[in-house]
Regions:
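Beta-propeller blade repeat segments, especially FG-GAP/WD-type strand-to-loop junctions
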Residues: 184-185, 194-196, 231-251, 289-296
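Compositionally biased P/S/T/G-rich terminal and signal peptide-adjacent segments
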Residues: 24-70, 135-139
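Terminal, regulation- and interaction-focused segments at domain boundaries
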Residues: 53-97
Length: 314
């Protein structure tokens, strides 16, 4: 009889705990991981529960407030797809260079959202934190500064921060790289992050820098960087065009103008920027601007008073 009574008490306590857990989730109180059942993904995110958009994915809630939610899910790939499809804002994705790295981070400088995505196991469970930064949306650097320590933790202790063209040149020299500093429509200091694998991770939206190309002369895609705030989004790809020539392809996506292929080409020290299309390994040139030079690892107009402009397709 005593054993039966004890068993009944345990069942009653378990039922009460389950009800309490459900109520806490609905009220967005901070929960401890130990309070979450790990048997299945019963909770589904709903946008009405938060002050920022969230996709309806199955998950386990770790903690939740109106402005921040931590969860475990097997559906983290749809998070990035969901946010990239939103009409407002542009997303930057930060990931370590190694494909097996457990962490990625993507954020929206306008809407003030940061999502960190950490691998838990090999089954597909990932811990995701969605943080709504309700602050200075018009100042992306203040926003990034808040997460600077997080970014350092994600990558390596030897991350180099450059805030000017001279720092960029020094940073690339230290890493044994050649940096290309490209002006768009403003001449302002840039901030970039170079990780220990020599990949460019983050740059100012007004400029971009890429590392040198290391290949055996064959066509080889080595890096792809997409970023954009407002007027245009740039996807930058660097590859070896032939053993004697370096070519960097920039596909510039204007919000209302469509896309344009841009190439930055160096041939025996002569640098030119051309607009065109790549067909069967050849470039069909639509327009060019060749008054450029590389000075201490910096790609710039030969006359400093002439800023480089993104070429527009006629």
């Amino acid at each position: 009889m005593r054993i039966i009574c004890i068993f009944c008490v345990i069942l009653i306590m378990s039922g009460c705990r389950s009800v309490t857990h459900k109520k806490e989730v609905q009220n967005h109180d901070v929960l401890e991981t130990s309070d979450i059942s790990t048997d299945n993904f019963e909770h589904t995110l709903k946008s009405d529960d938060f002050d920022f958009p969230v996709p309806e994915i199955s998950c386990k809630i770790i903690s939740s407030t109106k402005y921040k939610i931590s969860l475990i899910t097997t559906d983290s790939e749809n998070l990035e797809k969901y946010y990239k499809k939103l009409k407002e804002g542009n997303w930057q994705v930060l990931r370590p260079a190694t494909s097996g790295s457990p962490v990625s981070m993507y954020f929206n400088g306008f809407d003030g959202l940061v999502i960190t995505d950490s691998k838990i196991d090999d089954v597909g469970n990932r811990e995701v934190v969605i943080d709504y930064y309700n602050g200075k949306r018009d100042n992306s650097f203040e926003y990034i500064k808040k997460y600077e320590d997080i970014i350092r933790d994600f990558f390596s202790d030897d991350v180099i921060y450059a805030i000017s063209e001279y720092d960029i040149s020094e940073a690339t020299t230290k890493l044994g790289l050649r940096g290309f500093y490209v002006y768009t429509d403003k001449i302002e200091p840039a901030k970039l992050i170079i990780d220990k694998y020599n990949n460019i991770i983050l740059v100012n939206y007004d400029q971009f820098v890429i590392s040198d190309i290391d290949s055996d002369g064959e066509d080889e895609l080595i890096t792809r960087l997409g970023y954009g705030f407002g007027r245009y989004i740039i996807t930058l790809s660097a590859f070896k065009y032939n053993p004697k020539e370096m070519v960097m392809l920039c596909k510039t996506q204007y919000e209302q103008m469509g896309s344009l292929d841009m190439f930055i080409r160096e041939n025996n020290g002569n640098v030119e920027v051309i607009a065109g299309k790549q067909k069967n390994g050849e470039i069909d040139v639509l327009g060019s601007y060749g008054n450029l030079e590389i000075n201490n690892g910096v790609l710039r107009p030969k006359k400093k008073d002439i800023p480089f402009k993104i070429l527009e397709e006629n």
